[in-house]
C-alpha cells in the first residue's frame, strides 16, 4: 500500500477533526490530530467487520477510551461510509448523531459510550473476556479481536490498575491496546504529574509491550502484526505521538505539542485554523471534504471486508450444519432473549438472609442459564455469589470454560468489565460486593444506565445490621442515592435503573426473575446480611411474592385500615411485628405494604397505586436508610422512621434497640402519627 495515500488519509482525518471542532466552536482537536495515524491504519488494514451488517456478532471491536477524541472516531467512520459529512458538520449539536463524546451505536461502528477516562479500555477488557467465554463453548472459528485506544489520562486513572492487572493475569491475547502517548494533557505536560515507567508497569502485569513512533505508519503496521501473532498475552502498543500534529500558527511556524490544543478550537488555542488545514493538504475554504484517493482507499477496504465477511459467514454455515445443537444454543445466546427458567422450582430455606436466598437462586442459574457470567470483588463467600461459583469454576489464564470472574479488590474495574461483557453481547453479566462499596462502582453504574445495559448488581450487607464492622461498612445514604436512578429516565423514556430490595427469601427469588427479565436497563439487588423472617402468606408465599413485580403490594390486609405501614427489605418483617402490637393493644386496622421498587410501582396504573396506597389513609414508613428513601411512597403527611446519621459499631440486635428498629418503637411512632 502506498504510504503517500496512507499519510493523506491520516491527514484527512486530522482535517475533518479540526474542522468539526472549529465549526462547533467546542471540542478537542489536539489528541484527535495526533491519534489519526493509528486509527487510519487499523481501519484500512486490520479491523475486521461486515460493512453490510455492522452488528455482526463475530466482528472485531474498537473501544475508544478518551471520548473527547470523538472527532477522530467520527472522521474515520465517515471515511468508511458510516457518517455523512453533514453529520460531521453537526458535531455537538442538538439532535445530531455526533455528540461531543461518543454514545454507543454499533450500527455506525461506535462500540461504547466513552465516559470518564479509563472506563472505555476497561470495557474492552470485558469484551475480550466475553469473546474468550464464547470461543470456549463454540470454537475458535468465531474468534475475533478487541482493540482499544487509550490516552495519557486514561493510563493515569486508577481503574487502569485493575484493568491492566486482570487482562494480563487472564492472558487476554485477543486484546490489543494502543496507548496514544503524546505527553500532553489539558493543563500540563505529563511529566508534571507522573514519572512512572508505563512500559515496565504493563510488562509486570504480564502484557506484551511494544513501543513505537506513533505517527509512523510502518511502525504502527508492524506493531499490530506483532500483536496479532501474540499467543498468550494482551498487547499494549505505546505510540509516541504528537499532540496537534500538523498545527501551525498564522506565520506558518510549528504549533504542535501545545496543551492549548487539547480542549478548544485551534483558533482559540493560538494556531491558525486555515493555515493548519492548508498545511495538511486540505482546502481552508472547504475543509469538510474527503480526498478522492482517500475515498478510494476506504472503498477498497470495504470491498475486501465484504468478501472476508462472506467467507466467514460460509464458515459459520458449515459449522452450524455440522453442529446443529450448538448452533441453536449460540443463536439463543446472541438473540438477547430472556432465558427459559422455572423459578417455581427453587426451594428457599425458611427465614434466610436475602443474600443466602440469592445464593440459592444463583446456584440454580449456574446449572440452568448457560450464558451467564458472575463476578465478585474478593467477596464471593460473603456476598454469596459463591452460590454460582460452587456450581461452575473461575476463569483462569487459558481456560474460560467456567463462568466466574474472580476480580480481586477492584469494584469499579469489575463493574466496568461487566459493561464490556454486556456490550459484546450474548452473555448475561452480574457482579457482587457489599452495598457500601457501591460507592466505588457508581461511575460504571451510571454508564450502564446511559448505555441501557442489563447488568445485574448484587449488593449485600444492605444496612446498619452489618453490625460490628461499624459505620465505614454500614450503608445509610446509599439506598436513597441509588433510588434516584429510578427517577432518572434514559433516552428511551424508561427508568434508567431497576432497584429491588426484597423483603424475604421468596421475594428474592421473584426479584431475581425480574432482574433476568429486565433486558433494557441495569438492575440492582439490595440484600441483607442477617436472617429475615418469612413474611406472612395466606396460601403460598412464593405465589404471593410474585406481586413484587408491581413494585409494591399488600402483604397483610384489612378492610378499612387506620394506617398503612410501608417498607422494603428486612424492615418489612419489623413492621409485621409492630403491627401485632397495634392490633392487640389498640385494635387498629393495619395494612402492611412491601415496596421493593418504587420505580416499578410508579409504572403501574393509578388505579392500582391508589388501591395499595390510598391518598386518604395515614402512612408510616420504616427504613434503615435516610427517611427521604420512602418519602415518595409515604407522602408529606405521613411519618418515616429512619436514620439521620452514620451508624455505629455494635452487634446488630443491639443496634436495632438503640436505633429504634423494634416493634415497640414502631408502635409508639404510629400512635404519635395518629394522635
Q: At which residue positions do the language-model features occur?
A:
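Active-site flanking residues adjacent to catalytic metal/cofactor-binding acidic residues
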Residues: 151, 179-180, 239, 377, ...
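Thiamine diphosphate
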Residues: 1-145, 295-526, 530-533, 594, ...
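DG-centered beta-turn motif at the end of beta-strands
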Residues: 126, 144-157
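Catalytic metal-binding/acid-base residues of hydrolase active sites
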Residues: 154, 242, 380
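Residue-level marker for buried hydrophobic side chains located in beta-strands
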Residues: 148-149, 177, 375, 620
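N-terminal hydrophobic/helix-forming segments and targeting peptides
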Residues: 272-278, 293-297, 303
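Conserved beta-strand elements of the Class I
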Residues: 147, 373, 564-566
Amino acid at each position: 500500500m502506498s504510504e503517500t495515500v496512507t499519510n493523506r488519509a491520516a491527514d484527512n482525518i486530522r482535517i475533518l477533526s479540526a474542522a468539526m471542532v472549529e465549526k462547533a466552536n467546542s471540542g478537542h482537536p489536539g489528541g484527535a490530530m495526533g491519534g489519526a495515524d493509528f486509527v487510519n491504519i487499523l481501519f484500512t488494514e486490520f479491523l475486521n467487520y461486515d460493512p453490510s451488517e455492522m452488528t455482526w456478532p463475530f466482528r472485531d471491536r474498537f473501544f475508544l477510551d478518551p471520548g473527547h477524541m470523538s472527532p477522530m472516531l467520527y472522521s474515520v467512520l465517515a471515511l468508511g461510509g458510516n457518517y455523512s459529512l453533514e453529520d460531521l458538520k453537526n458535531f455537538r449539536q442538538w439532535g445530531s448523531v455526533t455528540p461531543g463524546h461518543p454514545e454507543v451505536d454499533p450500527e455506525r461502528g461506535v462500540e461504547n459510550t466513552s465516559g470518564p477516562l479509563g472506563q472505555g479500555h476497561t470495557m474492552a477488557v470485558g469484551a475480550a473476556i466475553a469473546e474468550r467465554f464464547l470461543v470456549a463453548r463454540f470454537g475458535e472459528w468465531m474468534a475475533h479481536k478487541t482493540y482499544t485506544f487509550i490516552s495519557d489520562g486514561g493510563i493515569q486513572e486508577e481503574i487502569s490498575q485493575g484493568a491492566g492487572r486482570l487482562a494480563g493475569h487472564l492472558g487476554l491475547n485477543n486484546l490489543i491496546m494502543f496507548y496514544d502517548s503524546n505527553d500532553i494533557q489539558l493543563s500540563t505536560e505529563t511529566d508534571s504529574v507522573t514519572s512512572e515507567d508505563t512500559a515496565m508497569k504493563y510488562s509486570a502485569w504480564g502484557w506484551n509491550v511494544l513501543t513505537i513512533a506513533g505517527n509512523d505508519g510502518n511502525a504502527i503496521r508492524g506493531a499490530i502484526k506483532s500483536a496479532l501473532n501474540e499467543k498468550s498475552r494482551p498487547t499494549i502498543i505505546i505510540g509516541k505521538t504528537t499532540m496537534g500534529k500538523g498545527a501551525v500558527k498564522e506565520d506558518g511556524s510549528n504549533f504542535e505539542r501545545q496543551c492549548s490544543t487539547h480542549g478548544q478550537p485551534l483558533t482559540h488555542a493560538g494556531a491558525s485554523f486555515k493555515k493548519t488545514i492548508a498545511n495538511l493538504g486540505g482546502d481552508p475554504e472547504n475543509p469538510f471534504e474527503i480526498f478522492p484517493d482517500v475515498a478510494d482507499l476506504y472503498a477498497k477496504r470495504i470491498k475486501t471486508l465484504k468478501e472476508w465477511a462472506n467467507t466467514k459467514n460460509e464458515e459459520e454455515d458449515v459449522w452450524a450444519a455440522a453442529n446443529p445443537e450448538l448452533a441453536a444454543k449460540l443463536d439463543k445466546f446472541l438473540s438477547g432473549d430472556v432465558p427459559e427458567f422455572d423459578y417455581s422450582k427453587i426451594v428457599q430455606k425458611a427465614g434466610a438472609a436475602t443474600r443466602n436466598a440469592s445464593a440459592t437462586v444463583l446456584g440454580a442459574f449456574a446449572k440452568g442459564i448457560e450464558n451467564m457470567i458472575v463476578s465478585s470483588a474478593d467477596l464471593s463467600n460473603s456476598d454469596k455469589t459463591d452460590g454460582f461459583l460452587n456450581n461452575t469454576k473461575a476463569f483462569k489464564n487459558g481456560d474460560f470454560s467456567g463462568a466466574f470472574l474472580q476480580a480481586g479488590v477492584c469494584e469499579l474495574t469489575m463493574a466496568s468489565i461487566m459493561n464490556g461483557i454486556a456490550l459484546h453481547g450474548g452473555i448475561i453479566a452480574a457482579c457482587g460486593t457489599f452495598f457500601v462499596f457501591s460507592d466505588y462502582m457508581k461511575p460504571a453504574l451510571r454508564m450502564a444506565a446511559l448505555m441501557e445495559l442489563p447488568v445485574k448488581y448484587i449488593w449485600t450487607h444492605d444496612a446498619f445490621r452489618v453490625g460490628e464492622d461499624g459505620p465505614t461498612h454500614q450503608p445509610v445514604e446509599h439506598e436513597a442515592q441509588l433510588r434516584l436512578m429510578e427517577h432518572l429516565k434514559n433516552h428511551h423514556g424508561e427508568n434508567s435503573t431497576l432497584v429491588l430490595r426484597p423483603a424475604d427469601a421468596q421475594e428474592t427469588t421473584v426479584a431475581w426473575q425480574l432482574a433476568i427479565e429486565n433486558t433494557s436497563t441495569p438492575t440492582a439487588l439490595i440484600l441483607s446480611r442477617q436472617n429475615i423472617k418469612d413474611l406472612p402468606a395466606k396460601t403460598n408465599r412464593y405465589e404471593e411474592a410474585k406481586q413484587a413485580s408491581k413494585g409494591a403490594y399488600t402483604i397483610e390486609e384489612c378492610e378499612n385500615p387506620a394506617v398503612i405501614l410501608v417498607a422494603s427489605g428486612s424492615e418489612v418483617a419489623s413492621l409485621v411485628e409492630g403491627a401485632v402490637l397495634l392490633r392487640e393493644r389498640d385494635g387498629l386496622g393495619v395494612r402492611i405494604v412491601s415496596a421493593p421498587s418504587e420505580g416499578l410501582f410508579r409504572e403501574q396504573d393509578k388505579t392500582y397505586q391508589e388501591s395499595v396506597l390510598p391518598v386518604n389513609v395515614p402512612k408510616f414508613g420504616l427504613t434503615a436508610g435516610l427517611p427521604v428513601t420512602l418519602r415518595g411512597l409515604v407522602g408529606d403527611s405521613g411519618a418515616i422512621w429512619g436514620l439521620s446519621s452514620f451508624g455505629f459499631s455494635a452487634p446488630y440486635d443491639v443496634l436495632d434497640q438503640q436505633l429504634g428498629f423494634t416493634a415497640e418503637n414502631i408502635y409508639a411512632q404510629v400512635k404519635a402519627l395518629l394522635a
